[in-house]
Amino acid sequence: MPVVYYATFVVIACAFFLIGRNFIDLKRHDEGNELMVERAAIIRSGANTFLKREDRAIVVVIGIVAIFYTLIHEAWAGPCMILGALLARSAVEIGMRGGTYGNVRTTNAARVTGAVSRTIRIALLGGSLSGFTVPAFGLVGFTIVFLVSGGARADVTGHSLLFANSVNAITIRLTAYSLGCSLVAMFNRVAGGTYTKSADIAADTVGKKNHGLDEDDPRNVCSIADLIGDCVNDIAGNISDLLESFVATPLACILIAMQTFKADPRMLTATCTFPFVLMTGGLVSTLLSVMFVILKNRKHHKWVMMTDAEFNEKYPDETNQPKYHDVAEKPGFKLVHVGYSLDIEDPSGELNLATAISAIIVMVVGVYGANRIFGGMAIPEFKLGWISPWVAAVLGIVSSVAIGKITEYYTSTKYAPVQDIAKAAIEGEAFLVSEGIAVACKSVLTPVIIIGVSMLVSNALCGTYGIAIAAVGMLSFVGTTVSIDAFGPIADNAGGIAESCGLPEEVREITDQLDAVGNTTAAIGKGNAIGSAAFAAVALIISYIGSYPAADHITTGLIVSVLVGLILGCAVEIYFIGVLTKNTERAAEKLADEAERQLNLPGVMEKTRLPNYNEAIELAADNALHYMLVPSILSVASPIVLGIPFGPDIVIGMLAGAVGTAIVMAIYNANAGGAFDNAKKLIEMGLLSGHPKGSPAHSAAIVGDTIGDIMKDVVAVCLDISIKTMSTVSNSMAMLFYSSSLRLF
């Protein structure tokens, strides 16, 4: 066994250690006053309730699909699928603990310290649990399945329990493992997106529009459901989505390597090993970069001497007082902890630092690994020799960073697009929405060009293997990306807890600052997820084309079938968007009705009694799980419904149409939603002169934010998992389409 696999397991063990260490460190921090503890417990309980209900559905679906794969495809495919689902679900559980324990501690850090640096540290500490689990859990299962199945060998065959078929056991088991991760991601993304955005829209409609309540006013039951939804979608959904991408990209590498280099055992071993070098190097870079930023913001306490009178005047509320010590030498004086002497002004700088460190480490590890693995080999397929795969990986890394920067430009409050949307709000809702649509449309072209150029250059350097390696490079430091992404919902939750508990305005100012950055990091994360999905899906389509004897026939003949499939693929994704949007709207209507009912109960508006949060939480969970059925079936069943009656050719067209449509629409929806959200945030932060919070411009911005909610947190995030699921299902069913389809036309 090559030394890289031993190194992989050592790094994974280090990741598991740091996950435990960071969770213990997180729980050491105080949750705050009694009301803060109570609010956090409700959010934690609600998130757990949703996941438990979702688990019942996941167990049934995974069980049925696993049995089908074991009976029809390969005997060990089902267990591998179950392993993938279990590891994905375990990663979600750990990440959710980081979010639901980190949110209130982030609030308390802002309350007690008044320092952005300390608040960032707690939020990133919670986010690191998500970031470390994604590559660690995804990689450990993938490596075990790969090695136990035989490793880099094209001659390992397997058989189903029902038929005497002969398949490559390694590729079918890895595909099944990836599909297990994919199905969990589909549940979390579709159900989680419906949950969070139905609650968010209902909270805004009932609270802000109908009753003039603040966003996180505790009288509005949907406000608590909204905070739970942030964890469910932006943490659980993001973890499972990017874990599936992290697994799908090396899968594409190995599938293509098995098809392209099966006649050359040495080359097959090298091309199958290199993705593990990049993924292991990426995990190392994540651990080092995230821990560096966490530890960097650890100290720098600032204490100020105050008289008792000054202290009591500044901090009259005993529940919101900072730490202090009575000075024995000076009776009547206190030494008060007021913050940190080296606080930071721009939180995004700390997060960008982690990304930069990760990218540099991966590139260094990658060039060393490429030299050790491919150095000295004569490889005609590699135009630049041994360094070609590394260049392809760097293209993926550069694409990831570039897409992130472009996304930041179109969605951050610091730049013109969001500022222009906020200014358009002065003229009313129609102008604001039109400006937002224009910004979103313009934001699509450059990322698509970057993705396209990277694919073309990677293909020119290493063939189709290069495209898959570029995807691995893009996702190699996914742990850093996920850590930063999880920072967003934790900061958002922290702000919600601060508002619902009536904490001082200074606390909300800090959490709002972090929340605005979190909105941008979430948009960047969505951009990276979409870009990586494009690379992975194209690589999987290429693998699908080469997976059966009729490959040449598919690409040159039956053009009509391919074109029909292309049109159907486009239509399926557009229909998918419509179903998601309508389902979220229906769920929001039901939640809004429940919120109105409870606000009309005696004493709720007067704050003499609390509403029943559990009723709204359970309603949101039931709606989400009910409405996820059709879109999930659409993604899983579409290739099968077309492939079995009409053959494999039409499926190629369907995949191509679906990928093209999904990538463009995902970027459009993600950036539109992020820009609308931060345009509202810009006004709420007082940055639109003469138009404060509560003004007509702010009301218009709320409308834009409500429209953008479904676009970015439901549609955009579900499109990328949809095309990955369709591509993975198609790869696993390719031989069945070829050998058993009815070929009606």
PLM regions and their residue ranges:
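Hydrophobic packing and interface segments
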Residues: 1-745
